[in-house]
Amino acid sequence: MISKTLLVSLFSSLTLLWIAALAPAFANTLVADLSLEEVAITTDFNGESLLLFGAVDNAQEDDIIVEFKGPALKIASRKKEQISGIWVNREAVNWRNAPSFYHLFSTRAISDFLSPEQQRELAIGYRNLGLEPQTASLPAEGLNNWIEALNRNMVERGLWFQHDGGVSINRGVLFRAPVSLPANILPGDYDVRVLHIRNGQLIAEDRTSIQVAKRGAGAFIYRVAHDYSVFYGLFAIAFAVLAGWVAAAAFRKT
């Protein structure tokens, strides 16, 4: 029986060959796609591997950047301080629009071919995500420190990362970037942006997306918990009380 991985690899290879045959006909053309259209989160979901692939015109000495961004969410960064030998949360910053997943892939270190100003213009990198704190006012230095702290936290959880050398280009036309989605990703639409860079300038750009969706019993529980949170909470309390009563009754009998 042919494995799923082998089928995906075969399909991707054939698609790459087809794209490569068309690429020379178009100047500064960039075409990208993903090996999967949807990632299903089931009860036994343990992450997923997929492949971003495509073709670009005359990129022998050029660079490719792939930005893989998940749905935005509200997230808090906390600063701990040691008081009387105990670490406690002293300060916190709540972010309105932090991406739940942010992985960058590039042919080499982005700082080798894009200056900080160019990265800012292209909105590349976690420092240029336009993160908005709910705190009314933060000095620039303080804001940067909080952004660095948020990045460290998300990197530790495998949700943000920068893969220098994560994109390979073959014969100046075909490119590919393996992508690994961890088990703790959120459902939603994941946007992919691919940039073709030459001498620090954007030559071409393409976008695609993939949906991550819960399936099966886990999807039903997730929808109930989010759409009917009050009833879900009451049911959880009632279930806990009933389970406790049954356990107590069983112990009394023994």
Identify the meaning behind each predicted range:
Residues 180, 203-233:
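Short, aromatic-rich amphipathic segments at membrane interfaces
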Residues 22-27:
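Sec/Tat signal peptide C-region and signal peptidase I cleavage site
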